[in-house]
A protein has these predicted regions:
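Structural preference for beta-rich elements and adjacent junctions enriched in aromatics
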Residues: 1-212
Length: 212
């Protein structure tokens, strides 16, 4: 799925462009696409991009709950222009969950924009705060025909090394102050039908885990 937006701004020099790590929030403008690919009006896959190229993804469930730990593999590119900023998004179908069918189907759809300096948020399909629900207020995307999905398999191997300096006797011919340690492992995801995904790690790299 390809998506894009041109977000006009009369003061492009004031666009908030804080550079953030993956899934960070911070002080930044944002554009997002929300896809209810089951069209159950309860589940949504959200993809956010900022003017600086920062990316966030999340899973909405039970209409109003959010899971920020959900991670997808997708791409985006953003550029600041003289009259605002623009962005393009590429979302592989393998990252979404949907019911394959040769017949035309409907998805829930919404677009979101955040202008940080005004604290302003806007939606293509209005989200009324006085109404209960979030995904259930999405608009409708029609005319989708999608074939059966291939088995979803994602493999992300890693290799890491560390150089540990250790004191010792410099006159010892076998002494080396460098103690190089290597490590390797792999993360994987295997799709089990359209509703389930098996996620696992072999020899996890705890050095890359953020401290809470």
């Amino acid at each position: 799925i390809y998506g894009g937006a041109y977000l006009f701004d009369k003061s492009p020099d004031s666009i908030a462009t804080q550079i953030l790590r993956k899934d960070g929030w911070g002080y930044s403008d944002w554009f997002a696409i929300g896809l209810d690919s089951y069209y159950d009006k309860r589940t949504c896959f959200g993809f956010h991009v900022s003017p600086s190229g920062s990316m966030r993804d999340m899973l909405h469930y039970n209409d109003t709950d959010t899971d920020d730990s959900w991670d997808a593999i997708w791409e985006s590119k953003s550029v600041i222009n003289n009259d605002g900023w623009s962005t393009e998004i590429k979302i592989p179908l393998s990252q979404l969950r949907y019911n394959p069918s040769e017949e035309e189907q409907r998805w829930g759809l919404n677009f979101y924009r955040r202008t940080a300096r005004y604290g302003e948020e806007s939606f293509w399909a209005p989200i009324f705060m006085e109404s209960k629900g979030f995904v259930s207020q999405f608009g409708i995307l029609k005319g989708i025909i999608l074939p059966k999905q291939n088995r979803r398999i994602e493999v992300l191997p890693y290799i890491s090394s560390a150089d540990k300096l250790e004191p010792g006797d410099s006159e010892d011919p076998y002494y080396s102050k460098h103690n190089i340690i290597g490590n390797m492992g792999v993360d994987f995801k295997i799709g089990l039908g359209s509703n389930f995904t098996l996620t696992g790690t072999i020899n996890p790299d705890f050095g890359q885990v953020e401290a809470e």
